[in-house]
Amino acid sequence: MLNQTSKKVLCTCLKCRQNDTEGVGCLISKSTRTRHRKQEKKTAEINSTLSSTTSSLSISDIRSSSESESSMLMDQDENIDFLHSNASEANIISTSVDRPEENGLNESSSLLDNMENLSSGRDDCFFNIDESDVEQELSPNVIDELSELSESSADNSDFKGEIQLTEELTCALRLFQVKSQCNLTDNAFHQTMVAVNGKYKDNDFCEYCQTSRFQTRKHVSRQQMAFFSIKDHLRIQYQDPKRSKELRYRANYTSRQGFGLDGIIGDIFDGARYQKLLSNGYFEDDRDVALMGSVDGYQIFQQKTDDCWVVLIINANICPEERVKKENLLIAAIIPGPKEPKDFNSFMYPIIKELKELEDGIDCYDRLKNETFLLHAHILSWSGDTPGLTKLMQLTGHNSYKGCRFCDIRGIYLNHVYFPTKPPMEKENEYERYDPENLPLRTHRQFKDRIFQLNQANSKRERKELETEFGIKGRSILFNLKAIHFPNSFPIDLMHLIYENIAYYMFKLWTGTFFNDNSDQNIGDYILSQSEWKIIGKEMHQARKEFPTCFGRPPRNIVLYHKGYKAKEWAAWITMYSLPLLKGRMPQKHYKGWAKFVNAVRLYQKLSLTSQDINDIRFLFQSFYDYYEKEYYQSLEERLSTMKLCFHNLLHIADSIENTGPCWATWQFLIERVCGMLLPLARSRLHPYKNIINNIHVWEMFNHLQFYQNMHTAIFPLQEVKHNSNNLAYSQPDSEEVLRSPSKRHNLRQSELKKIKEHFSTTHNVRGRKLMTKKGHQIGSKWARQNQDWAHNNYSVLVIMEVDRWSSFPQKTPEFVLKKFYGQVEYYLAYEFDKVTYMLAYIHWTADVREDSAGLISFQKFGAHEFIDAFAIDHYVGFFQIKTTYYVIDKDVDYTDE
């Protein structure tokens, strides 16, 4: 033993000093000490280079500690944690640095300081680069220049990032962006059920799975979640004058005449929640920020064994067209798996901590006004699917007796819990009956009182009974936020509710596959035969080219592919294809019942709603629910499974819109798209969660680089916009519409001459193939559709023109009204008459259209041809031919509002 000790020498490298309890160093072999010294020297050289290279790119500092400074000195076969933080009380990966005066959090908006942290030789560095990589990517001149820039910026406290970048340096930074798309892996994660903070901060073992908090023989936490600072996110944006101006959208929107009184609901600010906060003194400064939160979990691999949860923050102060773009979203937290989180409060702790500080106000510099102000931010809503909101709100979930978060309806158990308003006839005396138009709604005060009762329970058994009675498991950490109101701050997600649940269940009912195969309940006059469904699927497939490409994915055979349908395809099935395909095949009562649902969905999809629209939505969903409960449930116990919670939630949709604004503002399409973007980031099978977190952090850095205009423009020059002037056949200076090529001189036929005489006078001129509308749509023509194998029909149009209401009565004074017409564009014509050029469209009109009681428009044949002003074309539609009837498919539900 003595002999072995004598062969060892003292190593005082940073790693060994940290592993020694006294901080002196460790006794190791000479060869190991030599390797440590080389590694430490290499790390110091790389850090000197990279801290300068990337000093202008960070979005915010990383929470760190003295314990985290050894990561770059680990053995070469180990990966490095991009955002590792061993000493963090909550073991949360943050974009903030410890500062004593703010309890361990620091918000620095300096890009230079931030990227120094990111590239320093600490455990929060995000990737492991060897010396050869740096030498290959950065020439000595670039390295010297970066060092000079770093020194000059450090000496100048007023440095604003306005520096001159050489071509070599910009190439190096572009290369860094390319690297951000590569595989950045790190140490392995274990199952994550709780975050170690709050009541868990002193625990050494997880109380759910009993696994150790620390790595073997190291006082280092095994697991970390990623947290990205909301405060830094907002501060950085206000440093850019352009973005600071864009953040006034909320103030501009709410300053319109009649706001809050005109009954218009066009954004989340028209909802009752915002109006209530406004009346209570919130959002007094035009620069105060309104936020929206969203949570969702997804499977990172196809085998669906590894969960990952995302907390997304959306800035409602940005206009709707921009707030949904990737660069304007903030992924506030990544909760790694593989297990789903058991205590969601523990993971929300750092987010709520920052949101509370933002409620009280933080110092922020506004570059637009060149002044420091007190920035307040309040979160208006939290959205998510049912499992997500169940965790967030601390509810017992949709499988419990009190599964509805909006009302106190009690479910009925039959192998599962279901929610009819009328109990089965056999058990009318056992269960309560509810009025669908007057449900017992929950209130914020009721939530708080019930949580108090839970906490006063004398035993676990008593608490469990109260949880079942109330449908609440405990106190959500969201109660710490003043702006949150239970349950009105948690809107219904119509993407999952309508498109992925109800549409699918209705299809199963109509195909006779809803109940188990051994059940005798797969009967009813609403069921269509297999032969009818086969024809429906064939008609959908044959119509694939008859709809404009802007309608989305062409219809797929629903019989063959319904299991692979996504939300958008179910939405298209509901609003565009279902009524024409079911008309004449389904009994009239069922067709009319389903039409109420379809029309309600089409209404809530509108970008802007009126009070009358909301009343109509409430009435239509109520009517559909009554029809559904009567025809499909029939108050029979054996059919109780038809009354799933999703059908009950239809009764709360109108109230949800009134509270938090139109559905598009809060539905889950946005976070589902974010989860889809995160899927390819898990390139590492061994360390997928670190892989995802690393890449997201690099995303955030480049997203925030746009707010440092000079550097962003130098690194990523603006791309020259293509004006397609060569494709322009004709345009007018006072018009937003233009004619697109190809074009040619055209001699009008006799029949065309006759038609144009009716409009103006005879002549010939340039004929165009496409019309670019003011909405940016390119409406084609029959002349343009040359390749019939793949070209889609995008020349069927809706035309709105003024007509004389009394044209059949010449003696009456003309009274012009707007009227809709449908037709197909043969071609466009730039027509010159009396030195004035007109843009005309040669239209093949449909015959008279008919509208049935469900609002479905159809016609039997086409009619005459006519020249019209191209400006009268509003948008394109689809003509869905079924047998001898053409049905008008119109996806643009908002054309009347423009």
Where are these regions (language model features)?
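Short, flexible, mixed-charge glycine/proline-rich loop motifs
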Residues: M1-K7, T185, V194-D202, L392-H398
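Polybasic, low-complexity terminal segments and linkers that are predominantly intrinsically disordered
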Residues: M1-S157
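Residues immediately within or flanking Cys/His clusters that coordinate Zn2+
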Residues: K8-L10, N203, Y401, L840
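Cys/His/Pro-rich metal-binding microdomains
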Residues: T12-L14, E207-Y208, R405
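Domain-level detector for long, ordered catalytic/regulatory cores in large eukaryotic signaling
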Residues: D113-C125, V134-Q136, D202-N203, T211-D270, ...
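Acidic, metal-ligating active-site segments
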Residues: I264-G337, I409, P580-L582, R602-L603
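Compact, glycine/acidic-enriched structural inserts
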Residues: A316-C364, N703
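Terminal interaction-prone segments of large eukaryotic proteins
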Residues: F406-I409, Y434, N438, R442-F447, ...
